[in-house]
């Protein structure tokens, strides 16, 4: 007999459940990853997978990355509980930027809209004044004993005579402490204000690579071993060596931002492609073009979205604190 007051639990569709937890379905992840694979990378993946022992072949007919990944799913080589093969293939292609998508966690969209800041000079002035006040307070609150201990290195300290020091020695010590304290305050005030600014680090990755690897692999990869497994391992090793020899290098650098307007301008240029266009003249030099010959070369630029979000929150908090201090001071 069913209870009259009980209600059945609501049944959720798979898409609603994934949206609630901020996850991507397997096929949606295939669309995201496969849509960012180039034709050259598709040819390389099809070549490696078709050479596997017992592989039925036919991956070379895949017209897109989505079709190739769906074919792997139909063969049972890739599913929701086993993405190991896909992870290994992306590492072989040196596409480490696509590995975070395998977690199937939906990334939050970041708006390129900029924050209204007011006068940048006034905000920097407030930051300098607040940092200067903090340094003065910290220097004045230090104990004389700690300043005396750190005022001169241990090797230069003179041995004190046993017994109580004389009044003249105590007066000279007080005068030395006062002079060292004043000198330290003048040094702190004379330092540049950039040391006290709140900054955030944004990691920029720049990589140059060939647009096509297919012709080089066809010329440099071949195996005559009779056994299928040995031939597959031989081909895989040769392909890895060829790709490593064609690595044009990459640059990873951390850029410091102390102004929110500059950070948002940098992010807006990254989203619009202006940053990529500006870096092409820096990295794709004439010497590099002469080294690669007639082959086409492209430049890949990546900025971590999590770094931008964390840095924006940090600088925005600094702007709000500076405005609050300015209001209280007035």
From Swiss-Prot:
<feature type="region of interest" description="Disordered">
    <location>
        <begin position="104"/>
        <end position="195"/>
    </location>
</feature>
<dbReference type="GO" id="GO:0005634">
    <property type="term" value="C:nucleus"/>
</dbReference>
<protein>
    <recommendedName>
        <fullName>DNA-binding death effector domain-containing protein 2</fullName>
    </recommendedName>
</protein>
<dbReference type="InterPro" id="IPR038856">
    <property type="entry name" value="DEDD/DEDD2"/>
</dbReference>
<feature type="domain" description="DED">
    <location>
        <begin position="25"/>
        <end position="104"/>
    </location>
</feature>
<keyword id="KW-0539">Nucleus</keyword>
<keyword id="KW-0238">DNA-binding</keyword>
<feature type="compositionally biased region" description="Low complexity">
    <location>
        <begin position="137"/>
        <end position="147"/>
    </location>
</feature>
<dbReference type="GO" id="GO:0005730">
    <property type="term" value="C:nucleolus"/>
</dbReference>
<feature type="short sequence motif" description="Bipartite nuclear localization signal">
    <location>
        <begin position="156"/>
        <end position="174"/>
    </location>
</feature>
<dbReference type="InterPro" id="IPR011029">
    <property type="entry name" value="DEATH-like_dom_sf"/>
</dbReference>
<dbReference type="InterPro" id="IPR001875">
    <property type="entry name" value="DED_dom"/>
</dbReference>
<dbReference type="GO" id="GO:2001238">
    <property type="term" value="P:positive regulation of extrinsic apoptotic signaling pathway"/>
</dbReference>
<dbReference type="Pfam" id="PF01335">
    <property type="entry name" value="DED"/>
</dbReference>
<feature type="short sequence motif" description="Nuclear localization signal">
    <location>
        <begin position="104"/>
        <end position="109"/>
    </location>
</feature>
<dbReference type="GO" id="GO:0030262">
    <property type="term" value="P:apoptotic nuclear changes"/>
</dbReference>
<dbReference type="GO" id="GO:0008625">
    <property type="term" value="P:extrinsic apoptotic signaling pathway via death domain receptors"/>
</dbReference>
<dbReference type="InterPro" id="IPR049341">
    <property type="entry name" value="TRADD-like_N"/>
</dbReference>
<comment type="subunit">
    <text>Interacts with CASP8, CASP10 and GTF3C3. Homodimerizes and heterodimerizes with DEDD.</text>
</comment>
<keyword id="KW-0053">Apoptosis</keyword>
<dbReference type="GO" id="GO:0003677">
    <property type="term" value="F:DNA binding"/>
</dbReference>
<keyword id="KW-0805">Transcription regulation</keyword>
<dbReference type="GO" id="GO:0005654">
    <property type="term" value="C:nucleoplasm"/>
</dbReference>
<comment type="function">
    <text>May play a critical role in death receptor-induced apoptosis and may target CASP8 and CASP10 to the nucleus. May regulate degradation of intermediate filaments during apoptosis. May play a role in the general transcription machinery in the nucleus and might be an important regulator of the activity of GTF3C3.</text>
</comment>
<dbReference type="Pfam" id="PF20694">
    <property type="entry name" value="TRADD-like_N"/>
</dbReference>
<keyword id="KW-0804">Transcription</keyword>
């Amino acid at each position: 007999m069913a209870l009259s007051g009980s209600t059945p639990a609501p049944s959720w569709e798979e898409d609603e459940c994934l949206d609630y937890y901020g996850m991507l379905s397997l096929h949606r992840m295939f669309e995201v990853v496969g849509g960012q694979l180039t034709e050259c990378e598709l040819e390389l993946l099809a070549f490696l997978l078709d050479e596997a022992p017992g592989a039925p072949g036919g991956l070379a007919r895949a017209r897109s990355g989505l079709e190739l990944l769906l074919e792997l799913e139909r063969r049972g080589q890739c599913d929701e509980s086993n993405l190991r093969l896909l992870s290994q293939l992306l590492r072989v292609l040196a596409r480490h930027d696509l590995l975070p998508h395998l977690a199937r966690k939906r990334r939050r969209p970041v708006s390129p809209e900029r924050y209204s800041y007011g006068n940048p000079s006034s905000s920097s002035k407030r930051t300098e004044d607040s940092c200067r006040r903090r340094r003065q307070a910290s220097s004045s609150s230090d104990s004389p004993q700690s300043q005396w201990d750190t005022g001169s290195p241990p090797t230069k300290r003179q041995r004190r005579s046993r017994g109580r020091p004389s009044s003249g020695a105590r007066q000279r010590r007080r005068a030395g402490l006062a002079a060292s304290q004043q000198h330290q305050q003048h040094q702190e005030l004379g330092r540049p204000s950039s040391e006290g600014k709140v900054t955030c680090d944004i990691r920029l990755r720049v990589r140059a690579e060939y647009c096509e690897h297919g012709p080089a692999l066809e010329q440099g990869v071949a195996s005559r071993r009779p056994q299928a497994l040995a031939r597959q391992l031989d081909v895989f090793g040769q392909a890895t060596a060829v790709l490593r020899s064609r690595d044009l290098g990459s640059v990873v650098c951390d850029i410091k931002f102390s102004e929110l307007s500059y950070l948002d301008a940098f992010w807006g240029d990254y989203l619009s492609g202006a940053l990529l266009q500006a870096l092409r003249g820096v990295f794709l030099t004439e010497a590099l073009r002469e080294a690669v010959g007639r082959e086409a070369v492209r430049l890949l630029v990546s900025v971590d979205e999590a770094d931008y979000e964390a840095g924006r929150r940090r600088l925005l908090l600094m702007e709000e604190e500076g405005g609050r201090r300015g209001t209280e001071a007035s």
